[in-house]
Design a protein with these regions (language model features):
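Positively charged n-region of N-terminal signal peptides that target proteins for export
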Residues: 1-4
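N-terminal glycine/threonine-rich, aromatic-flanked beta-hairpin/loop signature
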Residues: 44-74
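Tryptophan-anchored aromatic micro-motifs
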Residues: 24-45
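Beta-sheet ligand-binding and adhesion/scaffold domains
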Residues: 84-128
Length: 128
């Protein structure tokens, strides 16, 4: 069964990207790899993209150090090798990344359950 096309507008790159959800997941280069996202010395995550649509993250530093959660994500090509990746965590936290695999950079916007927004950017490094 083919998933209907998604249209994802983005002001970040100044154009709209169109792709089917199935095509986006298949083209996503992170599947089968592990990355570290370094937002600051106190905010570092290991992102293990175990399979298309599933990722386990581990907090490696800061107040959430040691937290591990497996989430179901959606990856949408913005301008490959840049992808918008988003998911909802068990506590209701909503996370959106723009991951640029060509530049090794990641931007994140996080909406916490209490209504607070967190905006970070940093290095995205493949470790496996």
């Amino acid at each position: 069964m083919r998933v209907p096309s998604l249209v994802v507008p983005t002001l970040l790159f100044g154009f709209a990207a169109t792709a089917s959800a199935a095509d986006a997941q298949e083209a996503f280069p992170a599947v089968g790899h592990v990355y570290e996202a370094h937002f600051s010395a106190d905010t570092v995550f290991k992102l293990d993209f175990t399979q298309a649509g599933q990722m386990t993250y581990t907090s490696l530093a800061g107040p959430t150090r040691g937290k591990v959660e497996t989430v179901h994500y959606t990856a949408v090509p913005v301008q490959p090798p840049a992808f918008m990746v988003y998911w909802r965590e068990a506590d209701g936290t909503c996370v959106v990344h723009v991951e640029n695999f060509g530049r090794g950079h990641v931007w994140t916007n996080i909406a916490l359950p209490g209504g607070e927004f967190v905006h970070l950017d940093g290095e995205l490094k493949q470790v496996r």
